[in-house]
Amino acid sequence: MIRLILTDVDGTLTFDRDTYNIDLDAVDLLRKVEKKGIKVGLVSGNSYPVLRALYTYFGFNGGIVAENGCIVYYDNQLKEVCERVERSLISEFENRFGVKGSWQNQFKVCDFSFYPPILKDEMVKWALDKGLYIKTSGYAVHISKSKRGKAEGVRELIKMHGLDKAEVVGIGDSSTDIEFLEEVGIRVVVGNADESLKSIGDFVMREKSGKAVVEFIKKVITGEINE
C-alpha cells in the first residue's frame, strides 16, 4: 500500500526539463492524492528555503529533502544529514574554473551548485583532492561531501515517517535521481528522463515531466496502482 509519494522538482513537476514553470495540473492531482491519505514530499537539489516555500504553498505534508539529500524536514523537525562544505572552497572553485554559482548558494550549507552544468576532468580531480564529491545533474554542477546524494536524505525521511521502503513511491527525471529511487519501493520515471534512470524504473511513463506525474497519479487515484 502506498503511504508516501516523493517527487523531484526540476524536470519532474515542471512542464519540461528546460523550464522552471511548474505544471499546476500535477500539483493539483498530488493535492487530491493527499486527501486520500497518501502524503506527498519534495526531493531536490534546490535549497531548503525554496523547497519549503513550494511545499507550503502546494499544501503538501510528506516532508522535504533539500540540497540533494543533505537537509531533511518533516513534522516540524529539520535535520542536516551531511557534513557542511567550507565557503572558502566554494569561492576557490568559482575562481579556479570560471563558473558561476547559483543564486541559491547563499541559502545552502552542504550542497552547492554552479553553471554551466558541464563537468570537466580537472574539476573532478580538484574535488577529489579537497575531499569533495562532484557531479552534474544536467541543470548544474553540484559539489558536496555526500557520496550517496539524495539517497541519504530520502532514507532519513522514510525513517522519520516510520515506513518501509515498499510503501514509498519516488518520481524523478535525472541520473542524479538514481540513488533516490533505489531507496523507494516503486520507481516512477518521466518519459523524457535520462536513459540511465529509465533503466531502473518500475514505471516509465509515456508523458514527459509534469504530465508524466499526472499520468501516474491518475492511476493511483483510480486504484489501478496502490498495492
From Swiss-Prot:
Give the cofactors, semicolon-separated.
Answer: Mg(2+)
EC primary class:
hydrolase
Q: Which reaction does it catalyse?
A: 2-phosphoglycolate + H2O = glycolate + phosphate
* Active site residues of this protein: D8 (nucleophile)
Residues binding substrate are K150
Query: Sorted alphabetically, which SUPFAM superfamilies does this protein's record hold?
Result: HAD-like
What EC identifiers does the entry list? Answer: 3.1.3.18
Please provide the record's keywords in A-Z order.
Answer: Carbohydrate metabolism, Hydrolase, Magnesium, Metal-binding
Example of a GO cellular component annotation carried by this entry:
cytosol
Q: Which residues bind Mg(2+)?
A: D8, D10, D173, D177
Report the Pfam families cross-referenced here: Hydrolase_3 (PF08282)
MF terms in GO: magnesium ion binding; phosphoglycolate phosphatase activity
What function does this protein fulfil? Catalyzes the dephosphorylation of 2-phosphoglycolate.
So what family is this one in? Belongs to the archaeal SPP-like hydrolase family.
| Name the UniProt record assigns to this protein | Phosphoglycolate phosphatase
What is the source species?
A: Sulfolobus acidocaldarius (strain ATCC 33909 / DSM 639 / JCM 8929 / NBRC 15157 / NCIMB 11770)
